């Protein structure tokens, strides 16, 4: 899973904003954070959680897998991990070639 921390260049979203951007409920986000499928600093509870652009991509991928492929949350998270790894490897290959 991607461990992302907000930086000056990052888009920073609250639970509510992330849920709206991904067309899911806040409870959907909270459940996946609580089960470790979305990695975020959980100090202070959901009202203090902050998500960055990599979280947005991950959650959108997970939502897509769950809705379109009827994947369970764990499988959707695994697919999101693999998509991110492929993205990183492609970036490395571009740097080499």
Question: Where are the regions that the model predicts?
Answer:
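Arg/Lys-rich, alpha-helical DNA-contact motif
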Residues: 2-16, 20, 26-30, 34-97
